[in-house]
């Protein structure tokens, strides 16, 4: 059993790691997992990338058992098909992320699957090792673990291999942490820190999930209005 702090898409918001640090200090989870998309905000400059990268490096060294995942923004920058407003920075810092943080596509702990967007369709036939060994170019698909949008794509399904699992995902901005059922599989969406034209959009909370029971706690810690 593990208690895991889930850090959703940060998109160059370094103070999300300040919040995560305070949560870890107070609630003592076994480890944290970051769900990808640390790069790219469409209103960003190189200085924003430098500040965010410095904060991530600090967090990595303070909490070395943190697990880091790929998001669609990192993967597409690495395969030279960036989805960003700052192509130079996204490619440079995606490479730094790959080299320094050893990101994975998927992490499974007991009966909980962590990925950027969810494991569906033919991807849900693969085990954890095979998923993590996929060529990054194979992920440029609408149903892939970095692109799937389970709230909108009604053609997604989950093979029997993972039907009894819970999935924790980021990727799709939500106003609140929410649960959905896709083909019998519970999906918990936690991307609630995204902004709309630089204005707060989601409830800005993180969860700690028990990977044995699947129960989770929303963590509500005020981290001041100066995050942006």
Question: Which sequence ranges carry the predicted segments?
Answer:
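Short, solvent-exposed aromatic-acidic interface loops
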Residues: 218-228
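Core catalytic region of metal-dependent phosphoesterases/phosphodiesterases
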Residues: 7, 12-88, 92
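Active-site neighborhood of phospho(di)ester-bond hydrolases with catalytic His/Asp-centered motifs
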Residues: 6-8, 32-37, 67-72, 114-115, ...
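Beta-strand-turn-beta hairpins that frame and shape the catalytic cleft
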Residues: 1-5, 106-114, 183-186
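Conserved beta-sheet core of the metallophosphoesterase superfamily
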Residues: 150-220
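Short catalytic/ligand-binding loop motif for oxyanion handling, primarily in non-cytosolic enzymes
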Residues: 41-43, 75-79, 115, 121-124, ...
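Active-site-proximal loop/helix segment associated with metal-binding centers of metalloenzymes
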Residues: 88-94, 104, 108-163
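A general structural motif
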Residues: 1-2, 28-30, 63-65, 110, ...
